[in-house]
Amino acid sequence: MQTPSLSPPDIVAVLPAAGNGSRMQNDRPKQYLTIGNDATGHKTILEHTIDALLRHSRVRRVVVVISPDDAFFHTLAIASDPRICTVTGGRQRADSVLAGLSAVADGAWALVHDAARPCLHQDDLTRLLAIVEQSDVGGILAAPVRDTMKRSTDGFIDRTVERNDLWHALTPQLFPAALLKQCLQRALQDGVAVTDEASALEYCGYRPQIISGRADNIKVTRPEDLALAEFYLTSLQ
């Protein structure tokens, strides 16, 4: 149980945005593609994502982790916001998150969110941030699996997997910054595949909490996701 303190810890968002988004088949990384309409504003995916975070009163700052050759971020209007800073990322997502954590005080909590996940609902974020007062470990947003799940070998079904306890891991994921840094460093040193931040804590023996989140908190990965994200953004207005 979290020890009560006189003041709540700072919440600092870390957005790994150093990927090139090759599956989008575009001339720029997916986070710099423009989506929206007159209601939502015509902005890049990254700007929509940052807006969703900074709209919440508990989020103090956003650390955007960009690639060394990023030619786009500093052309955005949002880049001049004093609550936003950038650091240079690494080869893999975990390396980039570690780089972002270098700009986060150890006493703060790190809210790690996909740069290309712009449809975050404020009520989901509020419920996730509430675990700061309840936990020493942290937790993640996740959506329960609804489809029938199959395990296969060589393209043929082996068996149906029981789905009752299966979840789609989403972001944001929220952890004490010092703990997340320690777990990421250990997992990387041991050669463990870190597919999300929670997996690093799991490797180190911790059990992050699951907060049920909305399934429309999608990550834009393929060209067909653009229209869907734009639709969901409109519904948030």
Curated annotation (Swiss-Prot):
Q: Give the UniProt keywords, A-Z.
A: Isoprene biosynthesis, Nucleotidyltransferase, Transferase
Q: Which domain of life is it from?
A: Bacteria
Instruction: Give the record's GO biological process terms.
Output: isopentenyl diphosphate biosynthetic process, methylerythritol 4-phosphate pathway
Q: Is Transferase set as a keyword in this record? A: yes
Q: Catalysed reaction per UniProt? A: 2-C-methyl-D-erythritol 4-phosphate + CTP + H(+) = 4-CDP-2-C-methyl-D-erythritol + diphosphate
Give this protein's Gene Ontology molecular function annotations.
Answer: 2-C-methyl-D-erythritol 4-phosphate cytidylyltransferase activity
Q: What class of enzyme is it?
A: transferase
SUPFAM superfamilies per UniProt? Nucleotide-diphospho-sugar transferases
InterPro entries per UniProt: IspD, IspD/TarI, IspD/TarI_cytidylyltransf_bact, Nucleotide-diphossugar_trans
**What EC number(s) would the UniProt record show?**
2.7.7.60
Which residues carry the site feature described as Transition state stabilizer?
R23, K30
Report the pathway entry: Isoprenoid biosynthesis; isopentenyl diphosphate biosynthesis via DXP pathway; isopentenyl diphosphate from 1-deoxy-D-xylulose 5-phosphate: step 2/6
Q: Which family does it belong to?
A: Belongs to the IspD/TarI cytidylyltransferase family. IspD subfamily.
| Description of how the protein assembles with itself and partners | Homodimer.
According to UniProt, the name of this protein is: 2-C-methyl-D-erythritol 4-phosphate cytidylyltransferase
